[in-house]
Amino acid sequence: MKILIIQNRIGIGDMIIFLPFIEAISKKFGVPVSCLLKKNTKADQILKNNKFIKEIIFLERDKQNGKHDGFKGSIDLIFSLRNCKFDKVFIFNSSLRFNLISKLSGIKKIYQYPLFKKNKQHIIITAQRFLNKELGINVESKPIINIDNKSISNAKLKYNIDHNFKNILLGIGGSGPTKRIPPNIIIKFMELICDTNAAKFFLATGKDIDEQIILKEIMNSKFKDRCIPLDNLNIVDILPI
């Protein structure tokens, strides 16, 4: 049996939130699944040690310029999925587009959120109700990312992670402006932590100009000597930290 999961939200955090639901489907049918995900999710790096996921297929959409954008892009995606010969698909959205793509790809059994009901969908509760209704399973939202012990040990040595300090990883970026925390709030958080703890802060962010502005302001603050920026690293290098 070959199963496809479609999750088209753009962010890394969104992808991680859906991870327990993806794994629950794999466990239910006893086979690892394939996932159609946005490239921005960095899923190929984050999920490389996940035994429940067989392969990552990237959905390449970028403001009408991506491989899978528009009518031609949909046709390309249909042919790609048809060649995979999936038996079932679970679509974690209410998109008619993905419903039609799945049907035209020859997938016989399609499970999907109710069509045309995107508004006011709670990201976790909607997914929980979806799998409970379709498969009769209850899924807790407790995502776990598997990281091998050797990578963790190497990161401790490389970044001098001392357990006498509070070592705090701060995700100061975000997949959009509404998901980014202003730098003054992050700096205030650092003040509160450092009032009572010896702390070191690892700053995880991307190269987006708005994220770099946040990083620069933090690195120009009085906490700069306590901060280690991680913006030049891949996700696979950051995770063991």
Where are these regions (language model features)?
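Catalytic machinery of carbohydrate-active enzymes
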Residues: 1-241
